[in-house]
């Protein structure tokens, strides 16, 4: 089984295209993680999209445990054909082995820890925390392979790279964070115009740097010089 975590805010942009080749001929479970940060109507729409492709789908909030209780049952259901084949061969109670994959900072380790009910995998609010593969035994029925998050070498669409930067899947060291903040302000102003005034008490402006300065001033982040 391949368990693929995607960010519910950008489900397509947060999918490594190489995973489809990796998961060929294997049962697939897509987790719309951080579903609490996306709108319900879009979570439902994307769940239907992946189901139409033949994947099992669960909307989860790994940090708060939302949707986690249903996962082990979904895993067993997704692997029922293999479990039945094993049973006919006289192999009983063999644990399901599942690979957990996804891009950096999508929440794989947080998901594994939530599912296990204890800290099994190292977590952090930045990309690249998991450095190597490790098997984690949840119980007698399920074993998970935690894998490092990997981005693909080249983005065909520049907008994909921008979205990944917005959600923290790229290291700040390789980004111009001021330009990135301005791009995010432009995006929010276009598609979610109420967010910035509600969150940061700022007035809309066509120049994103004016808004950025307002936010910095309101948060006492402006230095003299």
Regions of interest found by a model, annotated:
Residues 6-9, 35, 115, 148:
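Anionic group-transfer/hydrolysis microenvironments
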Residues 27-29, 35-102, 120:
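Canonical P-loop GTPase G-domain recognition
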Residues 62, 112, 142-145:
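Conserved active-site beta-strand-loop modules that form the wall/rim of enzyme catalytic pockets
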Residues 1, 8-28, 41, 56, ...:
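Helix-rich effector regions associated with P-loop NTPase G domains
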Residues 97-117, 121, 147:
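Glycine-rich phosphate-binding P-loop
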Residues 7, 50, 111, 146-147:
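Residue-level signature of catalytic and energy-coupling elements of molecular machines
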